From Swiss-Prot:
Entries under PANTHER family matching the protein: 60S/50S RIBOSOMAL PROTEIN L6/L9 (PTHR11655), LARGE RIBOSOMAL SUBUNIT PROTEIN UL6M (PTHR11655:SF14)
GO molecular function: rRNA binding; structural constituent of ribosome
Name this protein carries in UniProt: Large ribosomal subunit protein uL6
Organism, as annotated: Chlamydia trachomatis serovar A (strain ATCC VR-571B / DSM 19440 / HAR-13)
Function: This protein binds to the 23S rRNA, and is important in its secondary structure. It is located near the subunit interface in the base of the L7/L12 stalk, and near the tRNA binding site of the peptidyltransferase center.
Sequence similarity: Belongs to the universal ribosomal protein uL6 family.
GO biological process: cytoplasmic translation
Amino acid sequence: MSRKARDPIVLPQGVEVSIQNDEISVKGPKGSLTQVLAKEVEIAVKGNEVFVTPAAHVVDRPGRIQGLYWALIANMVKGVHTGFEKRLEMIGVGFRAAVQGSLLDLSIGVSHPTKMPIPTGLEVSVEKNTLISIKGINKQLVGEFATCVRAKRPPEPYKGKGIRYENEYVRRKAGKAAKTGKK
């Protein structure tokens, strides 16, 4: 049994959970999210708590799927209540970003313009031309888009130039050592 899923998910004030057929929907002040449920879990809502238990017919390691759905529902509750945010910083001469309508325009030292469509449900803002903030209620969508932006120019280990998560540690390498020795 999953250790986290032993505890119920406590619903904050203003968040509602409803279960219909094989689908759970969570509504809150920031929006609503839905998730299709597997047949291996049973969800029960009692007051302001949500309980995730394995179904009676599951024999083979029920904790795996139980822990997965506990985490998915907990992230949905947190997303519709407070939301999620990922921040990226661009390091390099001439690196900058701008939001143009529903596109994120990146100048990252390549010969062609790099424009990325912003997925619906996300709010992207740029501060100081080099700090990108990605906000949304769906944790998976926020993380996936942040990873796609970072993958356009990941930080390189010699000078550290590129796009990185805020406060991400980039392991640095030493450059070529000066030649020494006899000729």
